[in-house]
Amino acid sequence: FGLLPPGPLVKADTAADGNLSTVLAFDVNDLYDLVDGRIEYKDYLVQYESAALPDREIVIDAARYQAVHGEGFEVLDGFEGQEGASLLTGEQGRVDWTVDIPESGLYHVSILYYPIEGKSSSIERMLLIDGEVPFQEAAYLQFDRIWDNQYDEVKRDNRGNDLRPQQIEKPEWREMLFKDYEGYYEQPFQFYFS
């Protein structure tokens, strides 16, 4: 599987050995080709209604990629208190991973991420499996930034009225399941991996 910033696209292919290789393409027009004609999540679930629900966790170490293409990638040890190595990604580029899926079935996917201060909008990514967006909603995955009041105490104006505190980003490590941010589906997405 793969994640990507808005614009460039991740493509994944299953190798002959059953491993999943993920790559990122740069042509934004590919986005429309990847999403065009994709089924909705509800239809995707019907398609895989008899699939197994493996009771296992598969961990992909982001810093153990096969290759990176582009700039802005850096492996950082102990970044912001997180043990081990983390992968800092830029806005564009490509990262290739190989993932072994020992048991075919429907899996939830989560990501441990640190939303580095930047734009005020949520982080958006896309997931592709075997080179395709599995369903429409997988093209628009959102990961929240963390906001807090700038000051611990509430300030008041000259009449004693509370003033709305200014919000600032306070990044921290978060684990987030891939889910529908439009609210149509309450449960996290399930993805079929083979």
Please tell me what each predicted stretch does.
Residues 2-9:
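C-terminal segment of classical bacterial N-terminal signal peptides
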Residues 13-194:
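Extracytoplasmic
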